[in-house]
Design a protein with these regions (language model features):
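Structural preference for solvent-exposed beta-strand-turn elements
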Residues: 1-207
Length: 207
């Protein structure tokens, strides 16, 4: 016999990363409830704080106060979080931030060229040196970008970089990936005239 109990599940990790990053560049205060409380999301919180975002934790939610980010004083430690490193690189490139991002031994073995190359094509000034992403102040142009990798992390990095691009960004992906980032951006900007154009040719689960 199974006893009935109430179980509170932690929030979705992928959505938690994106909610924190988008709130960090939004005007006014954002209140986020039921965030994932895992180590990867904490890495994103710590990196955003280092870039000037004001993030406060209460018993049931987080409050994010920030309208602009600033250059961090020290390299950003993404620890073991590939989502933090890949998405944050795109976000910071679009915000014209200068930063160095690195991770632990495991993260250092994961491929980063999949974001480096498309971001460079968009105008980002960055390199991958000794397992660190070295990002200089960039002017994102936008343009037509192709993503052959079935990864929502790569797609999201491109979209986040393109938010402040000089021109629009049209992204073509070989495989359809999860659309958390697109939906959240449009939801946070209900009254805007933004459009997010992503053309997909097939379906394959992304990250």
């Amino acid at each position: 016999m199974i006893n009935q109990k109430k179980i509170r599940l932690s929030g979705d990790k992928s959505i938690s990363h994106r909610a924190l990053m988008l709130s960090s560049i939004s005007s006014g205060a954002s209140q986020l409830s039921n965030l994932c409380d895992g180590a990867d999301v904490q890495s994103t919180i710590d990196c955003l704080k280092a870039c000037g975002a004001k993030i406060y934790k209460s018993e049931k939610s987080y409050t994010v106060n920030s309208s602009s980010l600033s250059n961090p004083n020290n390299p950003l430690n993404c620890r073991n979080s590939g989502t933090t490193m890949r998405l944050l690189t795109g976000l910071l490139a679009g915000q014209r931030i200068k930063a160095v991002l690195y991770g632990d031994t495991s993260l250092s073995k994961r491929p980063m060229d999949r974001i480096i190359e498309p971001l460079k094509k968009m105008g980002a000034n960055l390199d991958y040196i000794n397992n660190q992403i070295v990002l200089k102040k960039s002017s994102i142009r936008g343009g037509k970008i192709s993503n052959p990798t079935p990864s929502a992390q790569v797609k999201s990095s491109i979209i986040l970089a393109g938010l402040n691009g000089e021109a629009g960004t049209v992204l073509t992906e070989s495989y359809s990936t999860r659309d958390h980032t697109e939906k959240m951006i449009l939801k946070q900007n209900d009254n805007s005239k933004w459009e997010i154009l992503v053309f997909s040719y097939d379906f394959k689960s992304g990250e």
